[in-house]
Structure formats: structure tokens, C-alpha cells
């Protein structure tokens, strides 16, 4: 520990896209540089997350902002932090039955906004694609929002295709046949990507299949994708205000540390639909 400055940790699954970078910058904005040191860690998997939490405990880190991995059981480290009333704020994902502070986006509403937007454009058969498994907290909430909105609009659940555990590291040719089947046989006309990186992959995949966005297929995403061949304002997306989410999480943690007040605080950030050029009405 460095004398004179309080050391905190920020642990995210990865810090590799605009969403996570913006979130980290929001967290850092809450802590004056002259009085805090923030250690940034990438956890990548549950096992490494647990080791990082243990390292923070062993070295006397004063507080943690954690974007938690999705695990079937709470780790010993998380339970220890909870019992010790340790300054801890979860971000972007809360863990049911774990009574700790969190700042998350309203993923169910975000899913509903996606479905509502595409249905208003005339899309009746839609595919939701995620690189994570459908039972993870965030993905499950987004799917619930999509399906509930579909039910409210009398769209049969069979018209919504859920494609989870999508591997963005596969060569495009790996998915071309399966994707063409969805479009030609199942008549999918619009895709919702659960992650900005998945959206970018799908856009490039469609290009290899001579499918144009949005002329041939509509594509939208959670969070703002970045694709070299397109301007930053091209993609219709759900904005989760990740910078503000990070700033709010940092502010809560800073208050806990400086006041020694373990009071649990919950914040849910409202999503915004940003309509751009990657979605358009069905042309009959």
C-alpha cells in the first residue's frame, strides 16, 4: 500500500471495447488522482476473478468496483466481503440474494425497446444473438424484455429466435450457411446483438454474404458498435450510459470508504434507444 493515497480496485471481465473503457473512465472520474490509486484488473473467467478478489483482501485494498462474472454459486471471497461489510459496488450486473450495492442498466426495458422499435418498422421475425449463455443475468433480462414486449404486441414466441453462446472468434465462413438458413428459410429480417462486438462481427459476416445493412437486413445492438468501414453514428443501439453508470458506482464506493458507512445502495440506469441508420422499415 502506498502512503498518503487510498488504493482501490476495479475488476471487469475485460477492458477491450468502447463500453468497458467508457465505464472505467466513469469510475475513475469519481476519485481524485491526488488521493486515490485505482488498480485495473481483467478477470476473464470466474476462477481468476476469485483470485483477484483474494489478492485485494490480502493486500488491504480499501474498496472494489466489481463487474462480476456469472457463476453458479457465490465465491468464498464475495461472501467474506459481504460479511465484513467491505466497501464493494457491483456494476452492470447484480447477483440475486447477495445484498450489496450495485449500479446496473435496466436490461429488461432495453430488450423491450429493441423489440418495439423493430416491430414498428414492420419486422415480424427477429433474431437475438449473444456471445454469452442465455442464462447469464444480463442476457436473461434482455431476452425477458424482448419476449414480454412481443407478447404484448401479439407476436408469437416462435417468431423470436434466440442464438446464444455465439463465438465471435470463428471465421465468417463457419456461420454463413446457418445464417443464410435463418434469413431464407426462417425469414428473419432483423437481428439484435446483445454486445457491440457481436454486432460488429455480424455486420462483417453479412458483408461476406453480400447482404447489405439495412437494405437487406436490419441490425441493432446493445451499446454502440465501432466498425472501421462505417461512421460511428451508423448503428441503431441501446445506450446504457455506461460512463454515468461507472461514475455512479465510483461515487457510491467513495462515499462508503470515506464515511465508513456500509449502507447498501441500488441504482438502475434507464436505457435510451438511439435510432440511427442500421435499421429500416420492411419494404414490401
What kind of region is each of these model predictions?
Residues 1-116, 180-186, 197:
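Alpha-helical recognition/docking segments in bacterial nutrient-uptake
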Residues 18-33, 110-113, 137-156, 201-205, ...:
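Short, solvent-exposed amphipathic alpha-helices that sit
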Residues 103-128, 171-180, 199, 240-259:
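Hydrophobic alpha-helical segments within soluble ligand-binding/sensing domains
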Residues 114-153, 265-281:
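An alpha-beta-alpha
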Residues 124-125, 157-160, 213-218:
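Short acidic capping loops at alpha-helix termini that bridge into adjacent secondary structure
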Residues 180-284:
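Flexible loop/turn connectors
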Amino acid at each position: 500500500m502506498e502512503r498518503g493515497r487510498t488504493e482501490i480496485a476495479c475488476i471487469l471481465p475485460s477492458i477491450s471495447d468502447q463500453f468497458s473503457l467508457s465505464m472505467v473512465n466513469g469510475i475513475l472520474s469519481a476519485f481524485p488522482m491526488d488521493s486515490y490509486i485505482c488498480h485495473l484488473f481483467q478477470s476473464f473467467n470466474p476462477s481468476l476473478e476469485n483470485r483477484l478478489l483474494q489478492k485485494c483482501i490480502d493486500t488491504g485494498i480499501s474498496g472494489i468496483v466489481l463487474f462480476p462474472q456469472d457463476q453458479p454459486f457465490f465465491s468464498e471471497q464475495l461472501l467474506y466481503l459481504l460479511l465484513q461489510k467491505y466497501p464493494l459496488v457491483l456494476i452492470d450486473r447484480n447477483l440475486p440474494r447477495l445484498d450489496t450495492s450495485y449500479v446496473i442498466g435496466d436490461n429488461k426495458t432495453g430488450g423491450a425497446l429493441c423489440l418495439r422499435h423493430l416491430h414498428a418498422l414492420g419486422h415480424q421475425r427477429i433474431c437475438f444473438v449473444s456471445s454469452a449463455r442465455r442464462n447469464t443475468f444480463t442476457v436473461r433480462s434482455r431476452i425477458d424484455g424482448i419476449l414480454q414486449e412481443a407478447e404484448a404486441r401479439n407476436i408469437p414466441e416462435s417468431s423470436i429466435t434466440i442464438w446464444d453462446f455465439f463465438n465471435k472468434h470463428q471465421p465468417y465462413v463457419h456461420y454463413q450457411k446457418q445464417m443464410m438458413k435463418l434469413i431464407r428459410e426462417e425469414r428473419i429480417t432483423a437481428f439484435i446483438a446483445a454486445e457491440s462486438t457481436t454486432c460488429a462481427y455480424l455486420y462483417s459476416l453479412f458483408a461476406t454474404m453480400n447482404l447489405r445493412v439495412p437494405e437487406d437486413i436490419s441490425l441493432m445492438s446493445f451499446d454502440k458498435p465501432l466498425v472501421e468501414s462505417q461512421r460511428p453514428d451508423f448503428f441503431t443501439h441501446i445506450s446504457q450510459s455506461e460512463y454515468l453508470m461507472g461514475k455512479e458506482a465510483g461515487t457510491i464506493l467513495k462515499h462508503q470508504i470515506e464515511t465508513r458507512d456500509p449502507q447498501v445502495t441500488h441504482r438502475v440506469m434507464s436505457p435510451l434507444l438511439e435510432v440511427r441508420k442500421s435499421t429500416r422499415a420492411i419494404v414490401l
